[in-house]
Amino acid sequence: RAELLWANEPMSFWGTVDPQTGVIRDNRHALYQKNMSGKVLAFTTPKGSSGTGLIILEQVRTGCAPAAIINLRSDPVVLTGPIIAKRFYNVDIPVVNISEEDYAKLEGAREVEFFADRDEIDIYY
C-alpha cells in the first residue's frame, strides 16, 4: 500500500523528472513539484525518448524511484527501467496497465494497494 500520484496525461521522464530527488520539474505537467519517491505513479501513457528507462534506473540507484507505475498503456520506453532495476539492483517496480474506466476511478484516491495474486488494485480515498 502506497500513496498515489495521479495525472490524467502522458509523462516523459527525460527532462521532466529529477533522478536525484524524484521531483517532477516540468512546470507544464499536472504533477509539477510532486515527489514520486516511494509512491505509486499513475499517468496515462509514456511519452518521450528511450532515456526514460535510464532515468528510472538512476532513480532506483539514488533511492528516489516510484514504488509502482500504473498506465493505460505502457511501452518499452517505461518498461526498460524496471526490468533493468530488477536485474542490477534486485528492486521490483511493478508496472500495471488498466482500463480507462478503472484509471478514472483512481482520480482523487490517496493510496492504492496491489494484489497480484487476485489481479486487483484496492483504492483508498
Task: Show which residues each predicted segment covers.
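Feature captures the catalytic cores and cofactor-binding loops of soluble hydro-lyases/lyases
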Residues: 4-116
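Phosphate/diphosphate-binding glycine-rich loops and adjacent basic-rich segments that engage nucleotide
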Residues: 117-125
